[in-house]
Amino acid sequence: LENGVKKVLFSAPAKDDTATFVIGANADEYAGEAIVSNASCTTNGLAPVAKVLDDVFGIEKGLMTTIHSYTSSQPILDAKHKKDPRKGRSGAVNLVPTTTGAAKAISKVLPSLAGKMNGQAIRVPTPDVSMVDLTVTLNASVTVEDVQAAFKTASEGSHKGILGVDEEYRVSQDFVGEELSAVVAQDT
């Protein structure tokens, strides 16, 4: 830290052992570290959902797919990419399969999930809002109603202002400007 900078927060997964905090997962463990990571937008959407499921039912294993709006690293027109030809394809008109660090980063904010999550990403031609499709095997035998009730309870209690539930059949455009980290569709 130089030139008067007292703290640094970066919104990307740390590639080293930099402390990582996500609201709705482990932010209460922040102890004043000068340099911290807030993980990624996908991790911020995944972590509160995974925490509720793990705390209430226990997660044995999980697979997440983020359906992610295109990013500034994608070209508007097809172009060459050094490592992955698909990442060079136009972000504005293609579904682009790629990787995500969120499945790995989740273990930094929810250590109980270390080695239990895997993931992938699909970048899609929308300018804003992303979605996480999370499939888990739980330690408990549950019904859809049990899971819905757990999210509803969390959204009104421990995760109020962080996680919400959607009972209005909204689509991506309806979430532009959404302040919650995650909104769980109650109809699926």
Residue ranges with predicted function:
Residues 1-88:
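N-terminal Rossmann-like NAD(P) cofactor-binding subdomain of oxidoreductases
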